[in-house]
Design a protein with these regions (language model features):
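Beta-turn initiation residues at beta-strand->coil junctions
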Residues: 1, 15-20, 34-39, 54-59, ...
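Aromatic-rich beta-strand edge motifs centered on tyrosine
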Residues: 3-12, 22-31, 42-51, 62-70, ...
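Residue-level detector of conserved, well-ordered beta-strand and adjacent loop positions
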Residues: 8, 17, 26-28, 36, ...
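Phosphate-binding glycine-rich loops and adjacent basic patches that engage nucleotide phosphates
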Residues: 32-36, 48-55, 117-125
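Short, positively charged
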Residues: 41-56, 104, 109-112
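A motif-centric feature for acidic-aromatic and gly/ser/thr-rich catalytic loops and repeats
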Residues: 59-128, 134
Length: 138
């Protein structure tokens, strides 16, 4: 695996390229509001507490379901049906990603444990100022 990252003048990641596939992020302040990855396009909307609330994936809106700690535990379609479910251990290591859209939306949308951005390719969480390895609890 090869990975390259690009950061803006504020030190925030605006692009990652893994094995030749570029993912580009558009930021509003520190929040990712738009993302393209290969042929996928995602728009993100946030709640009053500045946590991810809605993702529009390739033109279709989905709602995030969060635990009290802010973990993204599910994604719902417009009818309230669960299309993706996530599970984590106590330190945020992914345990499962299931559902009818698990292999598409479930993998490409980045918000997971505590609402942090998860990189499927590296297994690391991007916390803006550092990366977090849930397998090592640091």
């Amino acid at each position: 695996m090869t990975a390259e990252f690009v950061y803006n003048a504020d030190g925030l990641r605006v692009q990652k390229t893994v094995n030749g596939v570029a993912t580009k992020y558009t930021l509003h302040g520190k929040n990712v509001v738009h993302m393209t990855s290969g042929t996928d396009e995602l728009h993100f909307f946030y709640d009053a507490q500045n946590r991810p609330a809605v993702v529009v994936y390739n033109g279709t809106a989905y709602a995030y379901v969060k635990s009290l700690q802010g973990d993204i535990v599910a994604i719902l379609d417009e009818n309230g049906n669960t299309v993706v479910s996530y599970g984590y251990d106590a330190w945020g290591a992914p345990l499962w990603c299931t559902g009818e859209l698990a292999e598409t939306l479930g993998k490409v949308q980045p918000f997971r444990y505590r609402g942090y951005v998860f990189d499927e390719e590296t297994g690391l969480y991007y916390l803006r100022s550092r990366y977090y390895n849930a397998e090592r609890s640091r």
